[in-house]
A protein has these predicted regions:
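Membrane-spanning alpha-helical segments of multipass transporters and channels
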Residues: 53-69, 73-79, 95-117, 122-218, ...
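Actinobacteria-biased recognition of intrinsically disordered, low-complexity terminal regions
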Residues: 1, 220-234
Length: 234
């Protein structure tokens, strides 16, 4: 057990170094909050009330943060062989790749949620918004843990521009990301429905929305890490 923990810790540290030094990772981290905020503008232009439109960026950011590691293995580049030789496989490998994303996503979302509620001057959506964010983030991480094993695709090399993408001879670059992205949305539909009920019917549905989102996220995350870890051993 201690050996597995040490391997997981080593994997986590190496991934954190990549996230801090590799501009491909840094660009991803910058794009997520920006994309979340930009979703408000077209909604406001379309006439969506501010108190509704302002709730959209948090779930969007949670979903994209969870989706980021769906191709994490490909970003390893030549360092992958050092990783393979070290014997880090299975669940420690999966968790080690996801922890750096969680360490970034959780503080960002923890700041974004209260700022959103302060902006609209309404704290009633606190539990529903937190529950939906947890569902989307953890579910996307779970699906990404599987997709990164079964459907990796070519990415730009270390040092290349993040906007420079290589040719991809297969459809992995299409169905892999889509599976992780849409999968998280599908399993979060019950939580989304409860959030809508909370907004329409009142705060009596708020606790149910929070716990449903948290339970969904944890369950999909655990299953995804377990399945991804097992597949990485094959």
């Amino acid at each position: 057990l201690h050996k597995e923990y040490r391997r997981q810790r080593q994997m986590c540290i190496r991934d954190r170094v990549y996230w801090l030094r590799d501009r491909r990772y840094i660009m991803n981290l910058i794009v997520v909050p920006v994309a979340g905020v930009l979703t408000v503008l077209p909604l406001l232009v379309a006439g969506v009330p501010l108190e509704i439109a302002a709730l959209v960026p948090v779930p969007v950011m949670a979903l994209f943060f969870g989706w980021l590691p769906h191709n994490d293995v490909a970003y390893d580049s030549t360092a992958l062989w050092t990783h393979v030789a070290s014997g880090v496989r299975g669940i420690p490998d999966r968790l080690g790749r996801l922890v750096p994303v969680i360490l970034v996503a959780v503080p960002v979302l923890a700041i974004a949620v209260p700022l959103t509620l302060l902006w609209i001057d309404d704290w009633r959506p606190l539990l529903p918004l937190t529950g939906l964010g947890a569902s989307l983030l953890l579910s996307a991480l779970g699906f990404s843990s599987i997709v990164s094993v079964i459907a990796p695709y070519a990415v730009s090399r270390p040092g290349d521009s993040p906007f420079q993408q290589p040719q991809r001879p297969t459809s992995r670059g299409a169905y892999g990301p889509a599976a992780a992205f849409l999968g998280a949305i599908v399993v979060s539909v019950p939580t989304i429905w409860l959030l809508v009920l909370t907004m329409l019917e009142g705060s009596q549905f708020a606790p149910a929305t929070f716990w449903a989102g948290l339970a969904t996220g944890i369950a999909v995350f655990a299953i995804g890490v377990g399945v991804g870890g097992r597949l990485s051993l094959i």
